[in-house]
Amino acid sequence: MKDSGDSKDQQLMVALRVRPISVAELEEGATLIAHKMDEQMVVLMDPMEDPDDILRAHRSREKSYLFDVAFDFTATQEMVYQATTKSLIEGVISGYNATVFAYGPTGCGKTYTMLGTDHEPGIYVRTLNDLFRAIEETSNDMEYEVSMSYLEIYNEMIRDLLNPALGYLELREDSKGVIQVAGITEVSTINAKEIMQLLMKGNRQRTQEPTAANQTSSRSHAVLQVAVRQRSRVKNILQEVRQGRLFMIDLAGSERASQTQNRGQRMKEGAHINRSLLALGNCINALSDKGSNKYINYRDSKLTRLLKDSLGGNSRTVMIAHISPASTAFEESRNTLTYAGRAKNIRTRVKQNLLNVSYHIAQYTSIIADLRGEIQRLKCKIDQQAGRGQARGKLDRGDIRHIQAEVQLHSGQEGPAEMGQLREQLISAFHEQMDVRRRLLELENQAMEVQIDTSRHLLTIAGWEHEKSRRALKWREERRKESYTKEDSEKDSDTGDEPDNLEPPEVASARENIAALVGEQKKLRKEKLALEQRCRELRARGRRLEETLPRRIGSEEQREVLSLLCRVHELEVENTEMQSHALLRDSALRHRREAVRRLEQHRSLCDEIIQGQRQIIDDYNLEVPRHLEELYEVYLRELEEGSLERATIMDRVASRALQDSSLPKITPAGATLTPDSDLESVKTLSSEAQRPQNNTLPPLGTDSESYHVFKASPRAWQVKSSSVPTPPPIQVGSLVTQEAPPQDSLGSQINSSPESSENLSEILLSHKERKEILTRTKCISVKAAQRRSRALGTEGRHLLAPATERSSLSLHSLSEADDARPPGQLACKRPPSPTLQHAISEDNLSSSTGEGPSRAVGPRGDGTGSWVRGQKKCLSKKREESLEAKRRKRRSRSFEVTGQGLSRPKTHLLGPRPSEGLSDRRMPACGRPSPGVRHLGKVSLPLAKVKFPPNQNTGSGNPSPLLVAPNQAGVSRRATRGPSLPHGSSTFGKDGRLQHN
């Protein structure tokens, strides 16, 4: 056995780590004096330096130090390990010695750097992990033997931490001058987990005691030694064995008795610690002197004897110095930096520990036996492979056809099995994904029910709070009135008791239920997040299988089966999504029915109040203000026409239709709705669909489908991309006055709104369909025409005017009429509805025949009192004179359109309405009669010219309203459509008026 290896000089690496300042130091008033300037330089400030010493009479002790690497309090354990120790592992495996030790005063973080914590492991754990990882990477070519020993030097006595029962051990020196510990336990293992367990066991045996300077002060020096032996797996007469050793040392900190306040055993321990560290400092001083050949006394301490090779022998050494940045530890920090700076000058001679083993001739026989055993093992392996080949048919090896047959047989046996396995994996992934989606659907339903219950309880509590505040206000008002009637009002107001506001049991129960429901909501939300994550994982798994299967499939039948499997899964996913949407719409429908029910209850209550108050007024002949009487007429007209009842009935029909169908009818793109389609039900569903809602299920990914076997079907994309036009909401409970413009017809609304012309072009009705609708509702038209004829008959004289005067009714004249109204009128603003009326609603039909809720109402029956008619006639005459005078002053230059083509203004005022009929609110329409109007009877109603306000833009649509002629005989008038204007023919002139191009 021969020791050989080339040697080379290696400089000792010194790193500095500055720990964070502690809370105790801050409480003492300490300041930061250690500052890291860059990656290598650290400056130590003098805390006693006088800033007013301009002449520098006192010498400053401020000094900068330069090291190989410096760390401040922001450095992590990983950064320290990567910069100092990681590079030593490769050398240890190759046969070099290495040493890492932490140096510094007590309480500066040496043990934290070497051992660390469970969350931030130190150099010990990180080094052993990387060491065994490097061994595993090269274990195929090399054989390794790893042994570990762990000891501590306590009061200059060596104790085995892995086996404390051995007592105190002694140091010995072998024939080569290497220091050994007699009787130390060395544990050999290749398992990293076992090494970690031994390390944890040794750390628990180490001596630690609290002092005034450090609550977890290490009272001993801990030395962890790891020995690695490496040899080649190839047997030969010459064998190379590399032996490397790694020392990791956690030194105890130097301490002052005045700071630690030690007594008794602690003081004795501190004395031994300082003695060994002093010997280490002397060795460093002696080794750092370059020009002198001083004797280096390693025998002053057992610590220096163990570190003999590490400091001046065969080892790559890293010293990590630790200091405190506090000004109270200035002297200790300066001494540590001084010794660390001197240690930089130490150079070691590093050589590889390589053992060349030459075997004796007598050992050749064992080597030959090992080689013969290896040959026999290889022969047996060859025979086994040949036997399997002969058992498959003893085919002729030279015939290419037999070889091809064998290959096909082999692939045929493996192909179906592999294909079946992949198919089973795909099906299982689909089933799991569907189960997760169904569970998500159930969770969504539960969350919806919890939300409904929570809203109900919150309404109960809110109602009680409102009632309580109302009672308190009423009680205070009564007490105030009572106090005014008494002489000692202040005394009475102070001695009153508050009303008893005990919560009802249902309110207390609601509060308790809300707390439980909130907890249930949180639980459901967590489960939903977990299921969504699981669903994403399953979709990714299924996508990977879909990518893999096409490459494994060879036949068209298998491809077809795979596509059918994917199709079935997609249909199941679509079914689940539709069920989710149906649940959401059922919930919305329940909310809507509840709101309608409450509105009906409120309306019935208001009707009772109005009738009762009206009865009191009639019984006692009370004087009623004019605007209140007009509002009452509006109320009577609503009751007579039954618009609210019709709206309620239509809502019930739509709700019943939605209840009967579990899923909405999705209209494909490009389809035209029939007149018989239930537009109201479609309106409800589409309006709910347009609201932003949370996804009930994770959406199918929109990834690229170029590699998928089965892509999304056209029907699936059609369902996803189709949009159902939204009909207008039915107007319920709104007051319509005389000054309100007429309702737009279906055709005018479609052509007057840019949005409706783009989105609702599919629902235009043909002439035949409109005629059929008008025929079915003939009775309604007859009734409307009769009322209109009576109104025109009473004021027919105003419709015939001199032909020489050319003026028409404009919105300006309407605004002038508004100016003539008396003050005190009720303002009622109502935004226009940009959507369509129902195709068969009575409001729309009455609008098309020239009679609607916005028209003048003739004399009512017995509902109106006779005592207000004289006032109305007087008001009508004054109004007529005012309008006639203003009409002569202004000449209308408006664009001639029919009255039914008017768009609704954005705002209008609810003012007093006279009762004479149409002539009271319209000026005489003079001029040439329109050729599109038929004359029925003696009185003819020419088309009125209407001027649009500047802020009312009818868009680029084509207004083609229904033209209606007055009917004196009470016969239902026939609706005809006027000539259609070209698209975009309406423009604004320079004067701000809409003109025809």
UniProtKB/Swiss-Prot annotation:
Keywords: ATP-binding, Cell projection, Cilium, Coiled coil, Cytoplasm, Cytoskeleton, Microtubule, Motor protein, Nucleotide-binding. This is Kinesin-like protein KIF19. Pfam families: Kinesin. Plus end-directed microtubule-dependent motor protein that regulates the length of motile cilia by mediating depolymerization of microtubules at ciliary tips. GO terms for cellular component: axoneme; cilium; microtubule. Residues 11-346 form the Kinesin motor domain. Strongly expressed in the oviduct and trachea. Expressed in testis, lung, ovary and brain. SMART domains: KISc. GO terms for biological process: axonemal microtubule depolymerization; microtubule-based movement; plus-end specific microtubule depolymerization. ATP binds at residues 104-111. Disulfide bonds: none annotated. Residues 750-759 have a biased composition (Low complexity). The keyword ATP-binding applies. SUPFAM superfamilies: P-loop containing nucleoside triphosphate hydrolases. One of its GO terms (molecular function) is microtubule binding. Residues 683-697, 835-851, 950-959 have a biased composition (Polar residues). It is found in: Cytoplasm, Cytoskeleton; Cell projection, Cilium. Disruption phenotype: Mice show growth retardation, higher mortality (4 weeks after birth) and display hydrocephalus as well as female infertility. Female infertility is probably caused by fallopian tube obstruction. Phenotypes are due to abnormally elongated cilia that cannot generate proper fluid flow. Residues 477-509, 665-704, 718-759, 784-997 are annotated as: Disordered. Belongs to the TRAFAC class myosin-kinesin ATPase superfamily. Kinesin family. Residues 477-494 have a biased composition (Basic and acidic residues). Residues 361-388, 506-551 form a coiled coil.
